[in-house]
């Protein structure tokens, strides 16, 4: 065989092996995912009342959506919860909207330049410090030690299932668990593009994440 024949031969078999590995890995994830789900169904629901649920909502110019976001989180079924909105240097009416919907369950962390608008990670880190130093020091929350405080990160346009704490809390009964990734759905699947995006999240969460959970190797995703 000539040089080009050998090159085509190598490319063909490398591609064949890669495809075979991909299909095999998909089947393995499907099998392990089903085993994990069966094991999970046998696990009793957790007691969400044991925990303080702290929902962190990064917000930059979310004046149109932030009131609805807070209302949705207020509808989440958690006995002990606090909603922390991080107003990350907004120059619209986000701050005014938050002032109008205040309550004992809502805390607002207002960031201003030069610290504001330095990225979502920086905003969340500031919120963690704010919760630790100020919120957990309040008499209403001093009964919760750090092992019984669960942070939930929710985008301003996100929707968390009302019964999520009941399902999530059972995972934290295992002290080796440090975080839980919930399944993500696209709720406005009104176009072909958003429908395909929803399918992507379904495959990623329902196959890859669940399959990896069997070995305890699932990871936290986000933007």
Task: Give short role names for the model-derived ranges.
Residues 1-49, 209:
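N-terminal membrane-anchoring/stem segments of glycan-assembly enzymes
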Residues 51-54, 82:
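Cell-envelope/extracellular polymer assembly enzymes that use nucleotide-activated donors
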Residues 62-65, 90:
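Donor nucleotide-sugar binding loop of glycosyltransferases
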Residues 67, 92-100, 120, 163:
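Acidic helix N-cap motif at the loop->helix transition within catalytic regions
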Residues 71-80:
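Short, acidic, metal-binding catalytic loop of nucleotide-sugar glycosyltransferases
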Residues 87-96, 111-116, 159:
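A conserved acidic beta->alpha catalytic loop
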Residues 110-113, 117-146, 162-223:
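Long helical/loop segments within the catalytic core of UDP-sugar-dependent glycosyltransferases
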Residues 151:
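Short aromatic/hydrophobic "clamp" motif used to bind/position activated sugar donors
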């Amino acid at each position: 065989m000539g040089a080009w024949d050998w090159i085509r031969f190598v490319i063909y078999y490398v591609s064949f092996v890669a495809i075979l590995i991909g299909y095999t890995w998909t089947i393995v994830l499907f099998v392990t995912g089903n085993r994990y789900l069966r094991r999970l169904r046998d696990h009793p629901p957790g007691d969400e009342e044991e925990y303080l649920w702290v929902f962190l909502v990064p917000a930059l110019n979310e004046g149109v959506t932030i009131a609805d976001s807070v209302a949705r989180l207020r509808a989440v079924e958690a006995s002990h919860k606090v909603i922390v909105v991080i107003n990350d240097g907004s120059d619209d009416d986000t701050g005014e909207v938050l002032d109008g919907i205040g309550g004992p369950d809502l805390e607002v962390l207002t960031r201003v330049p030069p610290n504001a608008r330095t990225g979502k990670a920086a905003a969340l880190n500031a919120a963690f410090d704010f919760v630790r130093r100020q919120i957990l020091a309040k008499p209403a929350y001093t009964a919760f030690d750090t092992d019984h405080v669960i942070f939930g990160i929710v985008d301003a346009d996100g929707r968390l299932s009302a019964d999520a704490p009941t399902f999530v809390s059972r995972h934290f009964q295992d002290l080796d668990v440090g975080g839980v990734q919930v399944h993500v759905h696209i709720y406005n699947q009104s176009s072909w593009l958003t429908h395909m995006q929803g399918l992507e999240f379904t495959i990623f969460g329902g196959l890859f994440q669940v399959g990896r959970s069997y070995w305890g190797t699932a990871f936290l995703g986000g933007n």
